[in-house]
């Protein structure tokens, strides 16, 4: 639409809701670490007193943003078909998660888009695994971030009895029938049996990676 990428009323309400949520969070709500966080006049910039009312303000602002977005016909993105030019995950959930912020036709869910064109040495090339065409994987999630993804059972990795967190760095062989990695090859234990968001957003050793045309289909790292 003509307003795509602009600071619309929906974008403003959404940003307000997010800021109030930050204000209510333990990071800012009663955090004693900010006791000496003052301006040059000695005035306290962040209160160190906890206030439950901040959560109510955040919730009210979020509901206001949701109602406004609903009236403006925003909706959750769903990728309904696989591209004929480039390979994409066949699983609907994984494909929708992957394409939400990639599909340039996604005008339904994205509220405040970055519309500037990226240059040659953009975040895209810094994020893509190294290949001869000029990508070098200079940006990657930390192990701590990887640990935050849930297991295939929808549980944190330290709460799922079927996931042995002590073996997360062990090298394992990918079993036959695996759809998110190459069967028979090796990867780390922590890459196995994770939730759809993990496979939609994280590239890992011998996991499938859509970096070629459909004529070649998936390749792997």
Language model regions located:
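Flexible helix-coil transition and linker loops at the boundaries of alpha-helical arrays
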Residues: 1-3
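An aromatic- and glycine-enriched ligand-binding surface/loop that stacks and positions planar moieties
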Residues: 10, 20-218
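Active-site neighborhood of glycoside hydrolase catalytic domains
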Residues: 16
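Active-site beta-strand/loop architecture of penicillin-binding DD-peptidases
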Residues: 221
């Amino acid at each position: 639409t003509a307003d795509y990428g602009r600071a619309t009323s929906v974008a403003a309400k959404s940003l307000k809701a997010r800021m109030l949520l930050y204000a209510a969070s333990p990071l800012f709500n009663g955090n004693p670490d900010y006791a000496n966080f003052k301006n040059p006049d000695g005035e306290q910039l962040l209160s160190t007193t906890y206030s439950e009312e901040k959560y109510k303000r955040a919730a009210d602002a979020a509901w206001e943003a949701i109602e406004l977005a609903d009236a403006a016909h925003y909706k959750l993105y769903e990728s309904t078909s696989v591209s004929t030019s480039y390979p994409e995950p066949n699983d609907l959930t994984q494909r929708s998660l992957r394409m939400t912020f990639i599909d340039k036709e996604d005008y339904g869910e994205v509220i405040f888009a970055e519309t500037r064109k990226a240059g040659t040495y953009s975040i895209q090339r810094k994020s893509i695994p190294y290949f001869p065409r000029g990508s070098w994987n200079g940006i990657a999630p930390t192990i701590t971030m990887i640990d935050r993804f849930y297991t295939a059972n929808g549980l944190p990795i330290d709460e799922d009895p079927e996931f042995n967190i002590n073996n997360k760095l062990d090298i394992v062989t990918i079993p036959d029938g695996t759809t998110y990695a190459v069967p028979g090859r090796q990867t780390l234990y922590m890459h196995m049996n994770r939730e759809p968001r993990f496979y939609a957003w994280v590239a890992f050793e011998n996991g499938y990676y859509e970096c070629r045309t459909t004529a070649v289909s998936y390749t792997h790292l």
